[in-house]
Every structure is written in structure tokens, then in C-alpha cells.
């Protein structure tokens, strides 16, 4: 074993040295593990976070003494070593110590051309990255003696001194430059965006150079043993003769493939012993480092050197497969596999994604409200979208904002783009429920509906029928049809979900409005439906006409007649829902929206309605104007409709109970959950409950069948949260509707907040968009008060949230800590929510095991 050198400022990377990722960074620790495994790693020295911070402040280590650790005045490289691989760092600098004398020595040993190329590359990198000179001054053609002389002259001309010849000075300047780059404002902001703390430290690794250039078999390459896209076993990478670093990855036709390939020569054919040795190293790393690694290597005169190893780059899909495979092979535990998959990354597996290898012509940006990507023709109206869909043409519904009237157009479209809106706007909520990629709040665009043109910030415009791509994952709109990657709901995904379900200790339900939504919820193993919005069932053409007849009825008898015709349709929907869910709980929210949402807009729509109802246009117009409200969100909707027009809730309750009897007769017993929306007072619950109980009693008598049901309240007004104790006395459950509760608590419109929300978050007014992440201080306090007061009166009451916050990992953490029984979110967010909940359980008592070296 080599003698250990341990100085105050730096530590030789040897098997027994005191090196830790928390003090020296992941790269230093990984190199030590490679040394312990017996891999051929060039001599390396680690500088701690503390040392690098001191260097940034002006205290330099004794670099001459540091260089004395290396044999025979070797050239060295400096590599960054942050605590987390994702946090990045300054770029690696190679060939430190290169000067006139070393150039002459290398020319004798390896030839003039190789030595000149090394020297020129170092002068260029040192001048631009260390001395911070203009890169244009050092652009050259052929790397020959003339180019080297010109580069040295350019440096001397800019710096008023010759290029430094002292290796110790070169190393000092490189260390200072990299340390200060890490401490810079832009670098700090960049790593904070990746989750690093503001005071995250940087270590540096000084490593002897394995040249990769010279006589004999020389070159450099990168190898990994799994596919970056799928995670399946596959040797990938490139090797470039007479090269250094990662040059092989950008070398084009000059680089060798690694395995035999019909497209050209390979490392396996040219250097079979080197290839076989790399495969052995890969197997050792996987088993002992407990990870799939990417290895950077150099071949120097036929000898293989391993310079670096990092976790293999991977897509979210590949990460799931890799984590599951490592657990299946007994290398890591199932719990570790779960913790290695970020919950939010699952969104990329559930929807098509833009191929990261393709070109992105971004024409607009907004809020990525529903993940995934889709390409299609622009459609400015729901009618146009339906027409295109009927012809088999994928289309993108482009609207200033969507309303319930656009439901059919959204069903016909493959994606949605709106100028206005935020994370809980109509387009966002429905988009997530339908699994449609959706970008909202794209305030830089302008839609001219009359001219049927979409204008984007760079001056271009798109007409109806033009093709665009919507990337709801990144919140971008792209010109044309770009290449997409298909979803990856394979066996490994389902295995990971099964492991998460075994750990998860809070219920995960889905928001589902139709039988199709329920089938999707079942496909993701949701534990029930936490929110079924019944109003979405009324927008089909035949039902919409009946709804409008009911709205324009002159008497209660006429309203009841129209509702009587809607009853079998609603009952059939509920029978389907109950049958699909097979005895799992289904929570049905009674009718909620204001009635005017079911009326057409514009004179032509009103005229068609007058024809359909056989009434004068003037009467239709007058009644429509009378239904209009100044602030419909706070107007005649929810329980207020149920009290003033009780026939609506009577019909819905009867449909639910008759469906319960029918579905229970042919399948698993059904215990429906009925939820009253927009409650703010105990008396509202009492009035609605008495009528629903009466309907239930009538159905029991008529059908001769007994059944049970649960009645609860959707807590979405601040007053309902504050008075939850007295409301709980009449409720089996309290489900917090956090979308509207956030709106009312903040006094914000979710449809308009996107116009200023980014500025508010950037300026620190809000830490996060409160429509995206549950506000723990304001809205969260109302949830805690409501939960506490509700359970103080009724300890067994069920508590949940059913707003879109239910699929957010941070919000799930809040609900779990508050003792909620379940969360409910859109079907496509169920896998994300389940994994996030599993993470919370595992993180409470888990520490990640170290590598086995």
C-alpha cells in the first residue's frame, strides 16, 4: 500500500484516507472507492470544501508541495467535486503543468504533433477559463506549431507577460479560478435551482494525467452499461484515439463505437483486452458501488486508466428500470429503490414526452399545467376541434381560456393551450383529469379568434390547421411536429408502484368524473374516487338540451319534468362508475357550478337555443341576462342551488341511490359517498341532509332493498373550516376543496393569477404558487383548524383533500402530518402521489446505506 499523505489543505486519495462526500464531495469519495476496489485510478489528491472556500477568499495552499506528491513532475488535471452530482461545478481543466520544457520532453517521447496539440489545448483552456480572456483570440485552425506560437503571443499581448511556465503557479491560478467560479452569484443561483443549499461547498480533485496521446495504443473514451433512454442492459459510449477527456462524445465519425457495430469499427474489435477489462470494472462498480455507473477512461500506450466514474445519465424511465433491477438483483433494498425515484419524475413515464435528442423551436412559454407532449393542428374553437378529430386529425385546442362549454373540444383535442390561467384554472384541472398535455398562462401569445390566428412573441403567427407541439411538462409551445417518446407503463413501473403501495400509509384516491375517468383511475390502482364532479356529465348534446330546459322552466313542476328525463342518464352513469370501481369508495359531489355556465355565448348560440326550446329569442335573451352574475364563483352555485332549487339535488340523490341498488345487485356492495359543495353554514347541511335522507327512505321502500350511504361536506370556504366542529355533527366526512379554499383565503382568481404569479414568487412575496403547492401557513392553518374542530366533535370523521394539491408531494406531506385519511388527485397523478407518500414513510427512519467499499 502506498504511503498516506494527509496535510491540512489536501488529502491523498488512498484507501484509508479520511474522505467523505460531505466534506470532500461525491467525486473524491467515489475515486477513493474505485481505489479500494483495485481499479487502475491515476494518483489523486482531494481538497476539502473548507480548503476551496479559503482559496476563494485568497488563502492559497502550498501548490509546489502538493505537486511533489505526484511522480516525476507529471501533468495534472483538476476536477470539481460537489456534494451532489446534480449540483454541477466548474469544468474540468486538463494538462496543468504544460510548459515549454514539458513540451520538449513530450515531443521526444510521443512526437512533435502530439506534444504541440497538448500544449495548444492547455493554452487555450487556461487563457479562456482561468485568465478569462476573449475566446475569439484563441480560435485556431490546425493544431500545429504556428497555431501554438500565435496562442502564446495572444496571451502575452493581453496579459503583458509571457504564458506562465511554473506548474505550481498554473495550479494555483486554476484552483483560485474554479473556487471563485463556484462562489459566484450565477453559479449559486444555478445550483440552488437544482436543490442545493445556498452555502453548498465544493471540493476539488487534483489528478495525475493519463495522456491518451502519444505512441502506441492511446485514446480516451466514456462507457456505460445501460441504455440512457430505457435503462435496459446495453453497452454505450464512444472511444477516440489520440484524445483526452470526454472528446470522444463529440468527435463524430472519428470515434469508435464500443461494441461491434455495422456502422463502423469498435473498441471491442480494435482493443479486445481493454474492452473486456472495462466490462469487468462495470460489473464490479454495479455490485460494490450499488449503482449503474458511467466510466471515463484513458488508454495510454496500451494501459487502461479509469479517470472518473459517475452515476450513468438516465431518463426518468431508465431510472425506474435501473432502480428496480438493482433491487431485484439483491444489490439494494426495495426501500432504497423507491427512494431513488423522485416522485415528480413519474409524470414523464405516464405521458408522451418531447424527445430530448431533437431540436426545439420554442415559440412561446407558459405554465406547464398538465404534463406530457402532443403535436397537432391548431383549432380555435371546440367545434373546430371536434371536426378535426372526426377526420382523424390530431388537434391542439387554443383558447384565451376554457370554460365548461369547451369540454367536448377538450375531449376531442390531444392538448390544450390557453393565454390565461394558472395551475388550478379550468383548462389545467380538466387537462390533468383527461391526461391532456396543457400549457396555460402563456401571456406572451395573442389569440385573434375572429381572424383565427395565434401570434407568438417572435412575430410569427399560426393559423387554424397549422401544426404546433405543446410540451406540458416544460410549459413550452414548439413550432411544427417534433419527435416524441411514448409512455413507459411497463412491468418495472408497476413493480415500483406495488412496492410503494405496500409502504404508503395514507389513502390515495382519484378525481374521476366519467366512466372513462374511473377506468383510468382503476388502471393506476387508485383506492377509490375522492371527487366525482357530476356537472361534467351534463355537457353531452342530449343532456345539455335537457339541462337548458330545466334552467328555463317556469315552475317547479316543469323543472321536475326536465330533471325526470335526466334521471335515467345520471343513474346509468353512476351504475357504470360503481361497476368499474367494484366496491371501492366513490365520493360524488352534488351539482356545483352556476347555471349560466350551461348557456350558450353569443347571439347565434342564443338563437339556436330559442329554436330548440321553441321560445322567443327575446325571452331567452332576457332570462340569460337575468342568470348572469357579477362574481359567479361566489354567487348562486353549490349548496345555494341545492337549497333554492332543491329538485336538482333530489334528482341526483335518487340517481345515486337507485344506481347503488342496481350495482350492488350485480357486483360488490356499494356504499356511496355524497358530498355537498360550497357549504359555509351548519344550517345548509341540515336542509340538504333532510331532503337526501327522505329520498333514500323513498328508494328503500320502492325497491324493497336496504342500503347505506355516507354524507359529507366539501370544505372550500374559510367559514366552513372555522365552523367545522358544528358542521361535523351532521357529516360523515370533511373533504377540503383546496382549489376554491385557496382562492377565497388569498382573494385570488385562479384563472387570472398566472399573469403575476411568477413575479410574486421571484420577488419572494409567495414562496411557491399557492395553487400548485399548498400554502402551509394560511390555507394550511385553516385545514388544521377544520380538522381539529371536526374531530373534536366527531373523532371518527374521515378527513381528506380533493383539490389538485392532492397530487403534490409537499402537500401530501402536510396532509399526512395533519392526520388526514386520504388525498385525492387526478388519475394521472395517482402514481406520483403514492410514491411521494411512500417516500415520507421511508424518510422518517431511513438513512441511505453506503456503497460496499
Located regions from the model:
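ATP-binding N-terminal substructure of ATP-dependent carboxylate-amine bond-forming enzymes
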Residues: 1-2, 442, 782, 815
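Conserved alpha/beta-domain cores
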Residues: 489-492, 499-853
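Glycine-rich phosphate/ribose-binding loops and adjacent secondary-structure elements
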Residues: 303-305, 403-411, 415, 423-429, ...
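Metal-dependent nuclease catalytic cores in nucleic-acid-processing enzymes
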Residues: 279-285, 438, 784-789
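Nucleotide/phosphate-binding sheet-loop regions of phosphoryl- and nucleotidyl-transfer enzymes
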Residues: 1-361, 383-389, 393-396, 403-408, ...
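Long, charged amphipathic helices and adjacent flexible linkers at domain junctions
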Residues: 193-195, 338-388, 393-394, 476-509, ...
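Short beta->alpha connector loops at strand-helix junctions that form conserved
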Residues: 45, 419-421, 440-443, 532, ...
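Structural motif
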Residues: 398-400, 419, 441, 511, ...
Amino acid at each position: 500500500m502506498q504511503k498516506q499523505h494527509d496535510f491540512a489543505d489536501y488529502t491523498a486519495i488512498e484507501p484509508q484516507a479520511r474522505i467523505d462526500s460531505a466534506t470532500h464531495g461525491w467525486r473524491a469519495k467515489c475515486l477513493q472507492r474505485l481505489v479500494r476496489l483495485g481499479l487502475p485510478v491515476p494518483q489523486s489528491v482531494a481538497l476539502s470544501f473548507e480548503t476551496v472556500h479559503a482559496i476563494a477568499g485568497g488563502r492559497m495552499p502550498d501548490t509546489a508541495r502538493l505537486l511533489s506528491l505526484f511522480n516525476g513532475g507529471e501533468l495534472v488535471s483538476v476536477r470539481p467535486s460537489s456534494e451532489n452530482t446534480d449540483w454541477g461545478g466548474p469544468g474540468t481543466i486538463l494538462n496543468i503543468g504544460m510548459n515549454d520544457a514539458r513540451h520538449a520532453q513530450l515531443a521526444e517521447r510521443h512526437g512533435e504533433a502530439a506534444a504541440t496539440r497538448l500544449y495548444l489545448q492547455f493554452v487555450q483552456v487556461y487563457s479562456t477559463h482561468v485568465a478569462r480572456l476573449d475566446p475569439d483570440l484563441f480560435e485556431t485552425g490546425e493544431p500545429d506549431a504556428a497555431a501554438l506560437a500565435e496562442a502564446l503571443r495572444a496571451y502575452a499581448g493581453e496579459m503583458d507577460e509571457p504564458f506562465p511556465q511554473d506548474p505550481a503557479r498554473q495550479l494555483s491560478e486554476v484552483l483560485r479560478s474554479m473556487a471563485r467560479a463556484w462562489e459566484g452569484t450565477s453559479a449559486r443561483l444555478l445550483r440552488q435551482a437544482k436543490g442545493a443549499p445556498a452555502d453548498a461547498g465544493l471540493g476539488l480533485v487534483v489528478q495525475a494525467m493519463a495522456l491518451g496521446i502519444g505512441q502506441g495504443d492511446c485514446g480516451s473514451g466514456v462507457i456505460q452499461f445501460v441504455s440512457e433512454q430505457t435503462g435496459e442492459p446495453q453497452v454505450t459510449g464512444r472511444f477516440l484515439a489520440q484524445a483526452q477527456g470526454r472528446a470522444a462524445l463529440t468527435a463524430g465519425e472519428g470515434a469508435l463505437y464500443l461494441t461491434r457495430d455495422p456502422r463502423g469499427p469498435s473498441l471491442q474489435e480494435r482493443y479486445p483486452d481493454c474492452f473486456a477489462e472495462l466490462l469487468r470494472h462495470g460489473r464490479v462498480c454495479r455490485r460494490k458501488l450499488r449503482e449503474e455507473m458511467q466510466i471515463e477512461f484513458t488508454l495510454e500506450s496500451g494501459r487502461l486508466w479509469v479517470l472518473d466514474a459517475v452515476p450513468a445519465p438516465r431518463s426518468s424511465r431508465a431510472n425506474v428500470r435501473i432502480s428496480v433491477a438493482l433491487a431485484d438483483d439483491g444489490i439494494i433494498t426495495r426501500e432504497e429503490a423507491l427512494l431513488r425515484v423522485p416522485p415528480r419524475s413519474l409524470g414523464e413515464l405516464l405521458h408522451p414526452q418531447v424527445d430530448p435528442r431533437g431540436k426545439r423551436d420554442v415559440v412561446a412559454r407558459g405554465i406547464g399545467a398538465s404534463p406530457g407532449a402532443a403535436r397537432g393542428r391548431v383549432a380555435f374553437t371546440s367545434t373546430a376541434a371536434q371536426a378535426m378529430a372526426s377526420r382523424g386529425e390530431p388537434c391542439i385546442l387554443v383558447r384565451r381560456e376554457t370554460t365548461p362549454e369547451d369540454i367536448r373540444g377538450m375531449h376531442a383535442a390531444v392538448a390544450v393551450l390557453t393565454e390565461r390561467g394558472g395551475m388550478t384554472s379550468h383548462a389545467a384541472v380538466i387537462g390533468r383529469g383527461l391526461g391532456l398535455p396543457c400549457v396555460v398562462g402563456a401571456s406572451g401569445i395573442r389569440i385573434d379568434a375572429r381572424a383565427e390566428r395565434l401570434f407568438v412573441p417572435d412575430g410569427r403567427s399560426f393559423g387554424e390547421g397549422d401544426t404546433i407541439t405543446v410540451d406540458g411538462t416544460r410549459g413550452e409551445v414548439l413550432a411544427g411536429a417534433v419527435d416524441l417518446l411514448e409512455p413507459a407503463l411497463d412491468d418495472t413501473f408497476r413493480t415500483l408502484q406495488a412496492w410503494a403501495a405496500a409502504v404508503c400509509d395514507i389513502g390515495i384516491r382519484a378525481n374521476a368524473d366519467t366512466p372513462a375517468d374511473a377506468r383510468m383511475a382503476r388502471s393506476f390502482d387508485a383506492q377509490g374516487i375522492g371527487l366525482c364532479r357530476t356537472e361534467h356529465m351534463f355537457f353531452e348534446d342530449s343532456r345539455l338540451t335537457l339541462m337548458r330546459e330545466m334552467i328555463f322552466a317556469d315552475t317547479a313542476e316543469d323543472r321536475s319534468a326536465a330533471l325526470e328525463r335526466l334521471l335515467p342518464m345520471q343513474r346509468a352513469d353512476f351504475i357504470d362508475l360503481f361497476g368499474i370501481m367494484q366496491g371501492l369508495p366513490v365520493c360524488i359531489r352534488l351539482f356545483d357550478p352556476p347555471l349560466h355556465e350551461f348557456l350558450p355565448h353569443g347571439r347565434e348560440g342564443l338563437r339556436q337555443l330559442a329554436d330548440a326550446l321553441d321560445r322567443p329569442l327575446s325571452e331567452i335573451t332576457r332570462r340569460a341576462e337575468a342568470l348572469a352574475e357579477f362574481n359567479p364563483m361566489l354567487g348562486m352555485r353549490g349548496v345555494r342551488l341545492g337549497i333554492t332549487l332543491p329538485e336538482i339535488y333530489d334528482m341526483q340523490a335518487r340517481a345515486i341511490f337507485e344506481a347503488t341498488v342496481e350495482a350492488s345487485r350485480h357486483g360488490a356492495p356499494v356504499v356511496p359517498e355524497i358530498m355537498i359543495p360550497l357549504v359555509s353554514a351548519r344550517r345548509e347541511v341540515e336542509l340538504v341532509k333532510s331532503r337526501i335522507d327522505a329520498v333514500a327512505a323513498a328508494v328503500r321502500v320502492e325497491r324493497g332493498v336496504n342500503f347505506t350511504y355516507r354524507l359529507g361536506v366539501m370544505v372550500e370556504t374559510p367559514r366552513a373550516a372555522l365552523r367545522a366542529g358544528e358542521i361535523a355533527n351532521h357529516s360523515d366526512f370533511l373533504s377540503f376543496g383546496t382549489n376554491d379554499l385557496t382562492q377565497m383565503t388569498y382573494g385570488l382568481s385562479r384563472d387570472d393569477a398566472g399573469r403575476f404569479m411568477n413575479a410574486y414568487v421571484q420577488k419572494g412575496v409567495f414562496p411557491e404558487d399557492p395553487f400548485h403547492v399548498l400554502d402551509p401557513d394560511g390555507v394550511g392553518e385553516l385545514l388544521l383548524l377544520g380538522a381539529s374542530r371536526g374531530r373534536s366533535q366527531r373523532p371518527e370523521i374521515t378527513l381528506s383533500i380533493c383539490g389538485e394539491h392532492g397530487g403534490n408531494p409537499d402537500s401530501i406531506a402536510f396532509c399526512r402530518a395533519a392526520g388526514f385519511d386520504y388525498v385525492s388527485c387526478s388519475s394521472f397523478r395517482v402514481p406520483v402521489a403514492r410514491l411521494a407518500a411512500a417516500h415520507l414513510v421511508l424518510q422518517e427512519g431511513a438513512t441511505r446505506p453506503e456503497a460496499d467499499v
